[in-house]
Structure formats: C-alpha cells, structure tokens
A protein has these predicted regions:
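Single conserved hydrophobic/aromatic residue that forms the stacking wall/gate
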Residues: 1-7, 12
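Core structural elements
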Residues: 73-93
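Flexible helix-coil linker/hinge segments at domain or subdomain boundaries
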Residues: 44, 48-75, 102-150
C-alpha cells in the first residue's frame, strides 16, 4: 500500500471528537516521508492554538522525521513504505503566551520527534530493561498525585 493511502486511511478511521488528526507536512503542499500522522492529545478549540499546532509544531515534527531519514535511522529506501503515528501534547496555555518563541518550540518538537524515532528504531528501551526496572519507574504525574501536588 502506498504511504499516501496508509496516511489517508489512518486519518479517516476512529476519529475522536476534537482530537485533530493530520498528516505532517513541510509546508501546505509538501507531505513528509515516511507519511506521518499527527494526533493531538488536546481538543483544539481556538484559532491561535490551531495555528501553532498545525504550523510550528507540525513543521517541526516533519523535520524531525526527515532528520531520521537523513542520518539513516530510517532507511531512505523504505521511506515510501512506512508510516509513523505521532501523539502530540501541546499545552493549551501556549495560545495565551504573548512571548512564545516559535523557534524554541520548533526546535523542541523537532528534537523530540527525532529522538523518539531513534529510540523506536533501536528498540529502546529493551523489554529486558523494562522488566528489570518496572518497580523503580514511577510516572511523574502519579508521583505528584501521591505527593498531594495535584
């Protein structure tokens, strides 16, 4: 199945109300390869947030994907055959930040995308490491709940 069809199929299935699903693009008419589906973890409800998510963050994710191809983490010869799904958390308060630095936001999401792909392609963390460390790892928000901070 061509990646464009895979991406389209991923976009139309199981839509969650308010949780936008879009293909990562370099610009309004240039889709990144491998086809990459972005799924927002936040209900998108205002134009500024949408523009930041579907502009700065979307472009950053697309560049992080290409960085993975450029350095060989993803085989260039398989770029048309693979699909990536990225679950995106962008704090809703970003739309109220008048001093938002789009370059910093772009760089953070580009690097995070690249690092996540690199880990995934290298099977990190390994199942052995996870099993060995399971009882030592506490989700930070669970810990905050235990500590009475949320």
């Amino acid at each position: 199945i061509p990646s464009s069809l895979v991406g389209s199929e991923m976009c139309i299935r199981d839509r969650a109300k308010g949780h936008s699903k879009v293909l990562a693009i370099m610009n309004t008419d240039i889709m990144v390869k491998p086809a990459t589906l972005m799924i927002s973890k936040v209900t998108v409800d205002n134009t500024r947030y949408t523009n930041i998510l579907m502009g700065t963050v979307q472009g950053a994710i697309a560049n992080g994907v290409l960085d993975s191809v450029r350095d060989g983490t993803i085989d260039k010869n398989k770029a048309n055959d693979l699909g990536i799904i990225v679950s995106v958390w962008l704090n809703p308060s970003v739309s109220k930040d008048d001093s938002l630095d789009h370059k910093i936001l772009f760089d953070i999401h580009r690097k995070a995308t690249y690092q996540a792909i690199k880990k995934a392609m290298n099977n990190e963390p390994s199942i052995d490491w996870l099993l060995e460390n399971q009882d030592n790892i506490v989700h930070k928000y669970y810990q905050m709940g235990l500590d009475g901070k949320i």
